Amino acid sequence: MRLSVSLGLASLWTAIGATALNVSQTNSSITLANDRLTAIFSNAGKVVDLYLDGQDLLGPASGSTGVGPYLDCYCTPKGFYTAGSTTPRMEVVQGTDATGTQYAGVILNDTYTPTGQQFQQYWFLRDGETGLHMFSRLAYYNETTPFLRNLQEFRTLFRPNTDLWTHLTSSELQTAPLPSDEAVGKQVVVQDATWRFNNTPNDAYYTQFSEYFTKYTFSNAWRDNNVHGLYADGSTSNGTTFGAWLVMNTKDTYYGGPLHSDLTVDGIVYNYIVSNHHGEGTPNITNGFDRTFGPQFYLFNGGGSSSLNELRSEAESLADPSWNVEFYDSIAKHVVGYVPSSKRGSVQGQIKLPRGATRPIAILTVDGQYFQDNSVDPRSYQYWVEMDANGKFQLDHVVEGKYRLTVYADGIFGDYVRDGVQVRGRKTTRINDSWQPESAGVEVWRLGTPDKSSGEFLHGVARDPTHPLHPPEYLIYWGAYDWQQDFPNGVNYTIGSSDPATDFNTVHWSVFGPTPDNPDVEYDTTHDWAINFSLTKKQLQKRKTATLTIQLAGAKTASGNTDVYKPDEPYTNLALESYINQQEEPLTMLIGFNQSSSCIVRSAVSCYQVRSRMTFPADWLQVGSNTLTLHLPRNATDVEDAILPGTVYVQYDALRLELS
C-alpha cells in the first residue's frame, strides 16, 4: 500500500493491523515506530527525531546538526545540495513482506528545478528491527543540457547534536574517544579539515590516540569496511550504552571496487555512496542518468551495558548481502530501480593462483574496463569476495549482465583479467582457469610487496608507539613526521641490506614542508631517490633486455582528485623518470591528470593505482655496483584552492628488475 501525502493535511494515524509497527502523520511530520525505535521525519525529508528505547539519539535539531539520516550531494551546477530543499513531496508505503514481517517506509521525492534533477530517498522500518533500510536515487532527464557535471559526492548522514556519543570507530585500529568540546574549541588548523589539539593535551583523544584530528584518519577501503559508527559508553546516559552504525550489507551500487576508500565517521556517521576522495572515479550526470543506490542499513542498538565490540559485532553480523533478501524482494515494487533476486545469479569458480600469492580476491566489475574505473558506466554493478588458498570463490546475488573478472593477490605483480563473464538470473556461471603471472625474464630484485599499498614503508602501517591506542602512522597526518630528520641526505637504498620499513619512505615527495613544527621547505633531498644494487657476470651473461616494473599505490599530479586537465599547471601530467647508472636518457613513466589522487595528504597509502613496465638494453647495466635513480621534477608544486601541500608526489607499491 502506498500513500502519497501532502503534509498540509490534517493529522492522520494509520497502523498496520493491531501491531506495534505504526505510522502517524501530521501537517508537518511523519512518524515510523515499532516497539523499540521511533523515527520522526520532517516535511523536508530529514529524520529530525530518533529514539531507541526512549533514548534521544540525535539531540536538538540546529541547522544541519541533530538530524539524519538524510541525503545530500555535491552534484548541482552550484555544488552542494540537500535533497528536499526545493519541492519535497513525501510518500508513505507499508505492508507485510514475504517472511510475514510488517514494514513501513517513507519516500522523499524532490526535483531541483534549475536543472530538473530528481532525488528520491527511501527509509524503511521493519517490525522487530532497530534500524532504517536506506536507498537513494538520482535521475536526470534533460535533452537541452545533455551533460550536466560529474556526480562528485552523493551521501547520507546521521548527524547528531548531543553529548550522548563518546567514541567513534571504523575498525579495531581506528577507534578513539571523540574530542571534547574544549579540544574542538581550542584546536589549531594545520591543513584543510585537519586540526591539532596541542592546546588541550589532557583531552582523551589527544592522550589515547593522536595529537591531530582529521576525518580522513577514519577512512577505510571498502574491501575492509563493513560497519562503522558511534558508540556511547554510558558516561552521559546513566550507564546505558548505545551504538549507531552504518552497515554496508550490500556494496554493489558503489563504484571503484574493493580499493575504493572513503570517509566513514568523524562525529557524523556517513554513507559515502559516491565521492572522488583518494582519487576515485565518479560518474558523469548526463541525459538519461538514473541510478538507485543501496540498500544499506543504519542500525541503532544497545540499551543495556554492552561494550563497543559487542555492539559492533551485532552490526557486523548484518553486513551480508544475503541478509533480508526476501524483505528487499518484497519492497522492490516501491523502490525505483532496485533489482530483485529473480534477476540475480551467481558466479562460482577456481583460478589456479601463482606461487606466492596471498590474500587473493575475485572481483566482478563492468566488462572491458579496469575495475577502479567502473564509474565510466553509471549503471554498472560490482562484487568481490575473498578467495581461499586454492583460488576457489563464489559470488552470489549478482545482477544479470556481462562482467569483467579481475583477480589480484599480495605478492604478485599485475592482475588476472577475464572479460565477457555472463551472469543470468537464478543461474550459476562457472569459471575454471589458471593465472599466468606476468614475466619479462628472470627477476633480479624487487623492492616492496606488490599489494596495491605503500604501507610497508616508513610511516606507513607501522603502529604509532607514542599513544596507547597505537594507530597506524599513515592515518595520522603527514606533517606529524619530519623528512629532514628521517632522511637528512635523501633516500639511498641498497637492495639486500637496507630495510624497507625504515630506509624507504611511504611517499616520494618533490617538496616537503612546512609542517607545524618545522617551517623549512625542503626540495634538495626529496626529488631524487637512489636504489643501489649489484649484479654478477653470470646474471648479465647473454642478457639483452632489462625490464623495470614500477607499481604506484597512488600519485598526485597538479590535478589532485579532480581528473580535470589544467593547462596552466606544468605538472597536470607528471613524469616520474628512472635513470639507469650514468645514462642521460631516462625511462619515463607518465602519470596522467586522470590518474591523480590526493593520497598520503588525506591519510591513505592505497589510492588510484598506476603502473608501468619499461624496457631498456641490458648493456646499460654493469657487473658490480649499479644505481637506479627515481626522479621527480625538483620543487614541483601546483596552486591549491584549500590549505593543502602544493607538492606533487608518488607512493610506491613495489618495483622490480627483470632480465631476459
Curated annotation (Swiss-Prot):
Enzyme Commission (EC) number: 4.2.2.23
Listed GO biological process terms: cell wall organization; polysaccharide catabolic process
Keyword Lyase: yes
Chain coiled-coil ranges: none
Catalytic function, reaction form: Endotype eliminative cleavage of L-alpha-rhamnopyranosyl-(1->4)-alpha-D-galactopyranosyluronic acid bonds of rhamnogalacturonan I domains in ramified hairy regions of pectin leaving L-rhamnopyranose at the reducing end and 4-deoxy-4,5-unsaturated D-galactopyranosyluronic acid at the non-reducing end
UniProt-listed Pfam families: CBM-like, fn3_3
GO molecular function: carbohydrate binding; rhamnogalacturonan endolyase activity
A GO cellular component entry from the record: extracellular region
Transit peptide listed as a keyword: no
Enzyme class: lyase
Signal peptide boundaries: 1-20
Function, as annotated: Pectinolytic enzymes consist of four classes of enzymes: pectin lyase, polygalacturonase, pectin methylesterase and rhamnogalacturonase. Degrades the rhamnogalacturonan I (RG-I) backbone of pectin.
The name this protein goes by in its record: Probable rhamnogalacturonate lyase B
